[in-house]
């Protein structure tokens, strides 16, 4: 995970450069303290981790988490190379772990900051064999962690029609969920991303000229269903709630948590957690009354930034 998430059909990287969305804004809100201890909860390709490490310096400690061992390998090479070439470099520890386990092994009030960039990385999207994108045909996998048992193929082929429709509606906010679920069940078995995308596209075909005019302005008809399956397979929203619940326990007073999300389901969870943490439990001071979004310049350079929203809070 990490370094941006997208529900757009392109499934491309960050303008080809792997620069994370809202990089400057995220680092500014994190307010890295030299010599501190920070957690990058979604290492991805190491873009955020690199910027944090540069500011930490040799006395500091950066802990990086990711479900995806392939992402950790890429980030590890980058960060290790920097550690060799730059003398003032912090200790870096990379762990194959979900951000839901952010508090594992951490003592209370010992962390200066937590950063989480939620969703799919370009490394995952661009690999057809991972099954995250319908832009290239591949197996219906969608697991961020290959150790997980549940795959998108199992979900698509084994949930009953009602359960499948509920998943598509709840996690994809897809208003045509029942029609799509019915088409999927009738088309079983479905083994590939291309087959699934074709089934969804046919099921979501506009019913009249007015709807057709509206649909032409929309995203690809399979986008929301693919999002729903990915979230369900990886338990993404449950993991996000676990992270937000654990963060106050491990943060020092004055420590910050910064979260970048890419769709309304995630943003709503972050917004509610920060607001409740500030008003009910009194352990957060919200730093972003409204979510921070990408500048027009960044959006022009990287269309994936258009849906990004950053929220930040400080431990009190």
Q: How would you describe each model-predicted region?
A:
Residues 1-316:
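S-adenosyl-L-methionine-dependent methyltransferase catalytic core, i.e., the SAM/SAH-binding region
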């Amino acid at each position: 995970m990490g370094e941006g998430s997208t529900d757009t059909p392109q499934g491309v990287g960050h303008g080809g450069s792997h620069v994370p969305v809202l990089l400057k804004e995220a680092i500014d809100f994190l307010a890295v303290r030299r010599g501190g201890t920070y957690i990058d909860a979604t290492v991805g390709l190491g873009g955020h981790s690199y910027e944090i490490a540069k500011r930490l310096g040799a006395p500091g400690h950066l802990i990086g988490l990711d479900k995806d061992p392939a992402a950790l390998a890429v980030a590890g090479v980058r960060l290790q190379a920097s550690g060799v070439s730059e003398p003032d470099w912090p200790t870096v520890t990379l762990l194959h772990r979900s951000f839901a386990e952010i508090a594992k092994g951490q003592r209370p009030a010992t962390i200066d900051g937590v950063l989480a960039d939620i969703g799919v990385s370009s490394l995952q999207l661009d690999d057809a064999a991972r099954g995250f994108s319908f832009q290239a045909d591949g197996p219906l996998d969608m697991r961020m962690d290959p150790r997980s048992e549940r795959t998108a193929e199992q979900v698509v082929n084994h949930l009953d029609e009602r359960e499948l429709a509920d998943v598509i509606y709840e996690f994809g906010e897809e208003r045509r969920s029942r029609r799509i679920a019915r088409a999927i069940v009738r088309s079983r078995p479905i083994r590939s991303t291309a087959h699934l995308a074709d089934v969804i596209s046919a099921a979501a075909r506009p019913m009249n000229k007015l709807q057709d005019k509206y649909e032409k302005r929309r995203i690809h008809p399979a986008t929301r269903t693919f999002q729903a399956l990915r979230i369900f397979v990886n338990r993404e929203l449950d993991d996000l709630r676990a992270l937000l619940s654990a963060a106050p326990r491990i943060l020092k007073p004055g420590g910050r948590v910064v979260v970048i999300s890419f769709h309304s389901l995630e943003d709503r969870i972050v917004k509610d957690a920060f607001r409740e943490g500030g008003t009910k439990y009194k352990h957060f001071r919200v730093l972003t009354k409204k979510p921070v979004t990408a500048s027009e310049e960044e959006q022009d350079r990287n269309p994936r930034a258009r849906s990004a929203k950053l929220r930040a809070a400080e431990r009190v």
